[in-house]
Swiss-Prot record, chain A:
Superkingdom field: Eukaryota
Record keyword Lipid biosynthesis present: no
Upper taxonomic lineage: Eukaryota, Metazoa, Chordata, Craniata, Vertebrata
GO BP annotations listed: mitochondrial electron transport, NADH to ubiquinone; mitochondrial respiratory chain complex I assembly
Top enzyme category: translocase
GO CC field: mitochondrial inner membrane; respiratory chain complex I
E.C. number: 7.1.1.2
Name of the protein described by the UniProt record: NADH-ubiquinone oxidoreductase chain 2
Naturally occurring in which organism (per UniProt): Felis catus
Record field: transmembrane: 3-23, 25-45, 59-79, 96-116, 122-142, 149-169, 178-198, 200-220, 242-262, 274-294, 325-345
Reactions mediated catalytically: a ubiquinone + NADH + 5 H(+)(in) = a ubiquinol + NAD(+) + 4 H(+)(out)
Length: 347, 175
């Protein structure tokens, strides 16, 4: 894309999210969402093939429908409360429908169908922005209305999301679809804790963004999009092989890596609120996620995947891709667990 | 009739939306769009927003829909689909109109209707002159506030419009 246009469009994506996050007026929330949506469409369509066009269209339609539902219930909230401020006491019906609209934007089950298809149709770097930056705005609004969210609705959606994120990702070999189902499952974890401790949701979001950023960057480093091509990284860049191992374990939520922090904190907060079955179900269905991360690890780092002999002897070229900030990100995605006692400042 | 004018206009508004939502060719859909724009202007006028209603006609119909009409004319197809061309479009149109008419009859018959919020039959659509808004119309004061206190909103909306144009050009550029 033409560089000045690209800069303007990225600026609008960023400012759209910033407007949603920082505003106290419901109209500006809607405007921010629409700015974000409009500006990210050309980023999704960076490559001009029909697959990318179809993915961008699907994304646009679902997000526009969600924005419309949000706008309608903003106006009905205005009818009942007489003011436009984003406060925590919403009309209960408006709160339910706004949660539904924001769940459509996030890709929570049962509105998750667009996530794998859109993520698969676009390039790796666009998928990166889609799965990390685009989650910030809806989650910030859910944070602001978190005290009035209907528990039945949000907990149902979150359990369904974790289950669908787990089972849906099992039969996938395409890395972008795997990351999409991983995103659905992580959103489920985040919304589960939202009613009880929104701070833990922010913690989970932060660690999820760091881990997903690192994963995508490692995939982009060798331009791999399938499991089969990822299994050849031992020959191209051996360092990436071990990093993928550690990162997948972190994504799966295993101690002693940073991915364990949000899961631990969420289960702790849920049990403090006397929910027992829910964190048990969440933890058990998260094992499905761990299974397909393990499969990636197995084919990449632990075995030599079947291939021709000619693919086992490659020239090692220097990587020309600019992987800004990748080493600090890898460190942050794997080694933050010893800093977990710092969370006591929240008390 | 003037007491129920907003109700009547809203019903016809929905019917004109149905007429282009049933997806005929864009030329015929554009006709429904025009009618909807004009009726929307009428609804806004009935709430006292004379300036904004006429803005709808001028900018929305006279600017944006005209451009839409020209681009549709450029992209026209040899056999455009009208509402009676194929059964799917006709069925959707009839479904939409029927749903709207049934809703309107239900509102007119029952005394109190609760769909999302309660309102008493068609009487709630009547605009009484409640409240003393002083010598100035609230709508004109709102527009004045947009350009004085609401500078940030003007910046945001202006930027969004610019981005809309840039995005459309970027998407349709191809190659």
């Amino acid at each position: 894309m033409n560089p000045p246009i690209f800069i303007i469009i990225m600026l609008t994506v960023i400012s759209g999210t910033m407007i949603v996050v920082t505003t106290s007026h419901w109209l500006l929330v809607w405007i921010g969402f629409e700015m974000n949506l409009l500006a990210i469409i050309p980023i999704l369509m960076k490559k001009y093939n029909p697959r990318a066009m179809e993915a961008a269209t699907k994304y646009f339609l679902t997000q526009a429908a969600a924005s419309m539902i949000l706008m309608m219930w903003i106006i009905i909230n205005l009818l009942h409360s007489g003011q436009w401020t984003v406060l925590k006491d919403l009309n209960p019906m408006a709160s339910i429908m706004m949660t539904t609209a924001l769940a459509m934007k996030l890709g929570l089950a049962p509105f998750h169908f667009w996530v794998p298809e859109v993520t698969q149709g676009i390039s790796m770097s666009s998928g990166l922005i889609l799965l990390t930056w685009q989650k910030i705005a809806p989650l910030s609004i859910l944070y602001q209305i978190s005290s009035t969210i209907n528990p039945n609705l949000i907990l149902t959606m979150s359990i369904l999301s974790v289950m669908i994120g787990g089972w849906g990702g099992l039969n996938q070999t395409q890395l972008r679809k795997i990351m999409a189902y991983s995103s659905i499952a992580h959103m489920g974890w985040m919304t589960a804790i939202m009613m009880y401790s929104p701070t833990m949701m922010i913690l989970n979001l932060t660690i999820y963004i760091i881990m997903t950023l690192t994963t995508f960057m490692l995939f982009m480093h060798n331009s791999t999009t399938t499991t089969a091509s990822l299994s050849q990284t031992w020959n191209k860049t051996p360092l990436i092989t071990s990093l993928i191992l550690v990162l997948m374990m972190s994504l799966g939520g295993l101690p002693p890596l940073s991915g364990f922090i949000p899961k631990w904190m969420i289960i702790q907060e849920l049990t403090k609120n006397e929910l027992i079955m829910m964190p048990t179900l969440l933890a058990m269905t998260a094992l499905l996620n761990l299974y397909f991360y393990m499969r990636l690890t197995y084919t990449t780092a632990l075995t030599m995947f079947p291939s021709n002999n000619s693919m086992k002897m490659k020239w090692r070229f220097e990587c020309t891709k600019k992987m800004t900030f990748l080493p600090p990100l890898v460190v942050m995605s794997t080694m933050l667990l010893p800093l977990a006692p710092m969370l006591s400042i929240l008390d | 009739m003037m007491t129920y004018i907003v109700f009547i206009l809203s019903t016809v508004f929905v019917v004109s939306f149905v007429s282009f939502s049933s997806k005929p060719s864009p030329i015929y859909g554009g006709f429904g769009f025009n009618v909807a724009g004009g009726i929307g202007c009428g609804i806004v006028l009935n709430f006292g927003g004379s300036f904004l209603g006429l803005m709808v006609f001028l900018i929305y119909l006279g600017g944006m829909l005209v451009v839409f009409g020209y681009t549709t004319a450029m992209a026209t197809e040899p056999y455009p689909e009208a509402w009676t061309s194929n059964k799917a479009v006709l069925a959707m149109f009839i479904t939409g109109v029927l749903a709207e008419l049934l809703t309107a009859c239900y509102i007119l018959k029952e005394d109190e209707v609760e769909v999302v919020f309660k309102f008493n039959g068609a009487g709630d659509w009547v605009i009484y002159d409640t409240g003393d808004s002083g010598f100035f119309s609230e709508e004109a004061m709102g527009i004045a506030a947009l350009y004085s206190y609401g500078t940030w909103l003007v910046v945001v909306t202006g930027w969004s419009l610019l981005i809309g144009v840039l995005v459309i050009m970027e998407v349709t550029r191809g190659n």
